[in-house]
Each structure stands twice: as structure tokens, then as C-alpha cells.
Amino acid sequence: METQNKHEIVDSVEKLEALLARVREAEKIFATYSQEQVDKIFKAAAIAANKARIPLAKMAVEETGMGVVEDKIIKNHYAAEYIYNAYKNTKTCGVIEEDSAFGMKKVAEPIGVVAAVIPTTNPTSTAIFKTLICLKTRNGIIISPHPRAKKSTIEAAKIVLEAAVKAGAPEGIIGWIDVPSLDMTNLLMQEADIILATGGPGMVKAAYSSGKPALGVGPGNTPAIIDDTADIVLAVNSIIHSKTFDNGMICASEQSCIVHEKIYKKVKDEFLYRGCYFLKKDELDKVRKTIIINGALNAKIVGQPAYKIAALAGVTIPETTKVLIGEVESVDISEEFAHEKLSPVLAMYKAKDFEDALSKAEHLIACLLYTSPSPRDRSVSR
């Protein structure tokens, strides 16, 4: 499913500078549009993106070799239909708020050109989301795709652009880099008016260091505490669902599970019952060496099913295995299982009590708590 590419191939700094100029001109025209015109464009683009959710998902998985088609369909659907419904009635043009008592008015104006850095983990859904919110706010946007996901990312952008232009948007309001590189991305971030950066820690840091306003979405490392008052079946099922959705590539998915020692065996048995695999000691060391290589997450495990990750480590497990679980003790950076893994690999810790569990979670990042109503939810909030 390829749309017609009517723009000049952007594969050099000179062509990127020309693209920036074209998008700026289109944005100046778009800035004059009324709310009614903008909403018509926003709706048409969202409908087009949603209609393409299935082929875009297939294209993303085929190109990147990561994730699950069915789950990427859901993500594309969410990025298109949910985002549209969430913002369709939001005023983004002209006076959006007025206080006659104080003689104040709040006026919405576009920022200009948005630099949108797109990750390989969620290429099409992220491109859909960022292009739609730029259309809703009358901003121009230039997409910098990940080299491993450029085909699917650009295709998503084309679909949104063509629908938007057909509905009345200026030609060239959405642009993209056809041959992405670090130099091109850095130039785009320096020249744009604001940056929406989604990616690894290095990319997000570069966005924040560019000298331009930036909103970064970087790595997560969410631990989950399963308290002794928790509904064990619910907690375990929720974690498995999170870790297997798109093969664990959602940054908010649990990376570690911290279990109260009173229910540790019951929780472990529930994971086993639901098709997870607990690594033996020698297997644990093999998988450790596969998770982190040269101080960074091994790209070969990202978005892969559990059995393939085990095979990379030289461990044989059933192909039906849902999640690889490593029982570990250290929450220090030296423990590979304590890192974000972006795959169906989970660290599992035993806690002596709730305070010990909370302490471990704080060392990792924050925490998600499975508990029955109790004073403990208040101690987490503190």
C-alpha cells in the first residue's frame, strides 16, 4: 500500500533546508485557517490514518522485525481514533478563553515548525499521533524517522498528508526526511521551533541540548509491587498482558516485579501456570549477557518473542513461552535485569515487607502497586 510521493527526496542537508523553508511557508498559510477549517482537516486525516491501521501495522512489523501485528493495529487505531475523539471539540484557533471580569483573553496561535523524532519501536502510531496534533494546532511538522523504520513511518505521514491536503490543508504542511541520519536529525532539531522527540536516552538528551524547546519521551523502567494484600491472579495477568503486548515495547510496561515474601511462591506459581518461564541459575547468566551489550540495551532482543531471546542466549524454551523471568536480588545498575528491556523479559525480586519493596522500587524509578485498599497506597504517594 504505497501512496504517491510528490515531494522532493530529502537526502542531504541542502534539501532538508529547502524542506524547512517549504513547510514554513505552508505553516504561514495554515495559521490563517479558521477553527472550522482546521477541524475538517483534523477529522479527514484521522479517518484516513485509522482506515490504514492494518496495512501500516503489517508494514511496520515487516520492516523492523519487531513487535506483533495485531497489537500495532491497536496502537494505530488508538493514535488515530482516540486522539481525534479526545481533541475534536478542543478550541485551537483564535480566542479560546475569555475572562470579562479581568478583561483577559487567551488566544491560541501555532508555534511554527515541529521537529518530530520517531522511534523504531512504535513508528506508525507515533507518526500518526504527532502529525494529527500538529494539524489540530495549525503547526507544520517535519518527521525524522528511525533508519530501521523509515518506510513505514513515511507511509503513515503520506497518508495523513494526502488526506489533510484533500480536506483543504496547505500543500507541504507535513514533511519528512527520506534518508535519515544523526546529522540530519540534529540539524532539524536546531532549525525547528519545537521538538517532539521519542526515542532512546541519547536522542532525547540531544533534543533537550539542541537549544530549542523540546518535549522528550525517553526510556521507562517501571517496577510493579505485588503486595501481600493484592489479588494475585489479577496482578500476574495484568503484568503478563503488559509484557506481551507488542512483545513488551511499550515504555510503560513493567520491567521488574517486586513481590512480598509471604506470597512469593503463589505469585511464582501463577506466572508458571500462565506460561511464563523462570530461568535457572546458569540460564540467568546467559540471558544477562544478552540483555545488555557494551553498556547498552541489545537491539536484537527488542520486540522479540521470549523464545527467540532465549535462543539468542543459548537457552532452549518452549515457543509458547510468554515471558522470560529472572529471579534477581540487586537493583543496582550493574544488574542487567534491573534495566529497561523493551521485550518480554521480566526481573522478579523478593521483598521482606512493604517498606523493603518500596525501597527497591525507588532505586529502579518509581512504582506501580497491586494492593487491596489499604494505608499503603498513601505511603506510596508520599
State where each predicted segment sits.
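Single conserved hydrophobic/aromatic residue that forms the stacking wall/gate
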Residues: 370-381
